[in-house]
Amino acid sequence: MKKILIFGCGAMGGAILSGCLAKGLWKKEEIYVKEHSEEASREKASRYGVHASMDGREAKEADLVILAVKPNVVPGVLQEISRYHPSRVLSIAAAVTLEALEGALPEETEVIRVMPNTPASVGEGMAAIAPGKKASPDFIREAEEIFSALGKEAVVTERQLDELGALSGAGPGYAFVIIDALADAGVLIGLPRKLAIEAAAQTLYGAAKMVLE
């Protein structure tokens, strides 16, 4: 049976977990979640119906370790798991480079860095996937499958990851501004606020689908 260990099950870690479970990529009995405390680990495990990891030792036998923690927490997590020689590590921590990840892990560990964006939480994200030096084609395909469950993805160089991350990461904020402006205009001409927001959002959503198709 597959074993997956997720460090950090907040907004993005939770989106990855929920999306992969919903798409049937993972089974609940395969998943272990590790938070900053045993209590938090148990709470998140209970919320998603998965296992709680108390000390991260599951990294030793895990098929995949996902780092979904804040960048300042990453060094401690890498130190914690490196002694277990994890086979594959996927990090979504912003600004933590492949060089830093690979340098802190055993030489044989396959590493991939991913930059998702917030719409992943509703299954419409855009993720940039940058494979490390040792990442196998099979691991790259696995990363593509995971983030396809959350929207769209693209395999890029690490430099392109930062560039695409800036575009898709900041992009939703600009879209929100446009939606608000359109909704305000709708209210000014007499529409109820709720209807104006819905119409504005659907208009942008439809336009985006036309571009993609």
Specify the residue positions occupied by each region the protein language model found.
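Internal alpha-helical scaffold of NAD(P)-dependent oxidoreductase catalytic cores
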Residues: 100-110, 126-164, 176-213
